[in-house]
Swiss-Prot record:
The keyword Nuclease applies. It is found in: Cytoplasm. HAMAP family: Nuclease_YqgF. This is Putative pre-16S rRNA nuclease. The keyword Disulfide bond does not apply. NCBIfam families: RNAse_H_YqgF. Could be a nuclease involved in processing of the 5'-end of pre-16S rRNA. It is an enzyme of class 3 (hydrolase). Keywords: Cytoplasm, Hydrolase, Nuclease, Ribosome biogenesis. It holds the Pfam family RuvX.
Amino acid sequence: MERISALGLDVGKKRIGVAGCDGTGLIATGLTTIERQSFPQDVQQLEALVKEREVQLLVIGLPYSMDGTIGFQAKKVQKFAKRLSTALELPIEYIDERLTSVEAETHLKSQKKYSRYNKGLVDRLAATIILQQWLDQRRASLI
């Protein structure tokens, strides 16, 4: 299997959860949470991670509506993703991220690590779930 270096992003209005994967493409790990201030600052922070980790691809969670349609929030994420792809000169792939934040909160609560004041941890774990889903789908398609 070829080496892969991807970042998983959970893009929100206030924060971006960021996850990375090991070179084998087996395991996603939460890296950081970016507090959003402006697009140039978002790019600057992500650019540092892209260079450090030699990223080849961005995997971005797309918040489809529960009925499977692309709603207002998903369109905002797509617009941001296209700008980010251009700025970082990286391809993007989307993955359905419905309920990843709920899954992240449930996981943290089960580990007694959840705090409604630490939304950054939820965003980072949601990004990890997004990237892990993509890695699992990719691996399954190669079998």
